[in-house]
Amino acid sequence: MAARPQQPPMEMPDLSNAIVAQDEMGRPFIIVKDQGNKKRQHGLEAKKSHILAARSVASIIKTSLGPRGLDKILISPDGEITITNDGATILSQMELDNEIAKLLVQLSKSQDDEIGDGTTGVVVLASALLDQALELIQKGIHPIKIANGFDEAAKLAISKLEETCDDISASNDELFRDFLLRAAKTSLGSKIVSKDHDRFAEMAVEAVINVMDKDRKDVDFDLIKMQGRVGGSISDSKLINGVILDKDFSHPQMPKCVLPKEGSDGVKLAILTCPFEPPKPKTKHKLDISSVEEYQKLQTYEQDKFKEMIDDVKKAGADVVICQWGFDDEANHLLLQNDLPAVRWVGGQELEHIAISTNGRIVPRFQDLSKDKLGTCSRIYEQEFGTTKDRMLIIEQSKETKTVTCFVRGSNKMIVDEAERALHDSLCVVRNLVKDSRVVYGGGAAEVTMSLAVSEEADKQRGIDQYAFRGFAQALDTIPMTLAENSGLDPIGTLSTLKSKQLKEKISNIGVDCLGYGSNDMKELFVVDPFIGKKQQILLATQLCRMILKIDNVIISGKDEY
């Protein structure tokens, strides 16, 4: 009888993700966790799911594009209301579960962080690219070939953009300032402040010119402070050459306005981080006072110390004391007696702004205070608002200042917040033009120019790349079509008119006449976008599209319900 062949030993299953349970008879059985709840999408189904998610996000903010774009009202879980048409703000405040939708939010944030404007356009363009990619995938073209084709088309589009852009830098500073002013107005066209865009554009340009580093051609936004206050109207907003403190003088009898003394070049400020109080032991201590004499001796000691501190300040020549810490009523009274107006409980960041603005030094000890460490400003005054008891201190500079404050007013908090966001976008546009003075023309003119160049190149391509090039060109057409649609125009008719005009007249500044000026010449209307902003839009949208096209599997692990 032949021997039975020996069976290989059975491998033990992986029980690391399992639990042992017993039935009602006490018999053991094994439950493998996660298997029932785990979901998986792959292949075309996964890509469709991603692109539909991107399309749904883009459809929400699409109607906010352009000067005729509409606003959105966003209500947070705790009931806070935000009204805005800023793409980055809309997306950041939306509750999104889908992973691809979250990538679009990050895309918008990246554009906002890097450029500050064009956050809506970059999401609309990325969604349009993904829509075109889906059509090509359904025709049987491999996603990587589509992504490679899009990359090549993006390079061509950017090179065309570089050919057709204009440089607005001028040897005359006044002319360059005028260009910056008109560019700032373009960015404010779609915002809530569009009726006062002259005032806000002026604020943005003045702020950037005051603080910019002319040698490096850069602007430090930390030197431009934004301060909003509910009350008044948007037209009451103004630029302060200096710093605004949400404080008032420490004593109600102190003067409401401090002006330079005769023969002085300005009001002298002592900026202190040391408290106005007698010195204390560093270690834990206990002070026993057993008689009235001892208490009076202690009180006299405290008064002497306060007088020493005030003498140090006056000896240095200070007119006003700005202190990071508080001081008690006795110190406050002595400051009033010695004609030294003071401000207490000023934050560390505000102290830095004051020091930069007044060219002073922050002093940690009274003994270190000297004349050369004092800050100088043209005046300090207290401003009241309406019938409320709200007060603000304004430290103002009449000479060239290193810090500015944009003081924004509005009838309610939502308007103030949206006005601040609009002003931030405008500041970013001006900053970008200071860094790189090249501009492309708005109203979809740049996109139409790039679309025509990419379509022309598509006809020269022999392989599958031609489909990707045409898809990229059609995605670029989405921007002018959306602008036309949001302006109440016929999208397809408007696009075909723009393309025929650009081809016929061989100029790249023909765009959508969103505001009904009767002219499509964006150069004449001076509707411009910074070149670096438009270039960044193309690059970021193409990179995101490539990343999403490379995903073919989505595995969602379920939650344990045991």
UniProtKB/Swiss-Prot annotation:
Main location: cytoplasm
CC per GO annotation: chaperonin-containing T-complex
The keyword Nucleotide-binding appears for this protein: yes
Oxidoreductase among keywords: no
Chain segments annotated as transmembrane: none
Subcellular location field: Cytoplasm
Keywords: ATP-binding, Chaperone, Cytoplasm, Nucleotide-binding
Positions of disulphide bridges: none
Pfam families from the UniProt entry: Cpn60_TCP1
Subunit structure: Heterooligomeric complex of about 850 to 900 kDa that forms two stacked rings, 12 to 16 nm in diameter.
NCBIfam families membership: chap_CCT_epsi, thermosome_alpha, thermosome_beta
Family membership: Belongs to the TCP-1 chaperonin family.
Function: Molecular chaperone; assists the folding of proteins upon ATP hydrolysis. Known to play a role, in vitro, in the folding of actin and tubulin. In yeast may play a role in mitotic spindle formation.
Protein name, UniProt field: T-complex protein 1 subunit epsilon
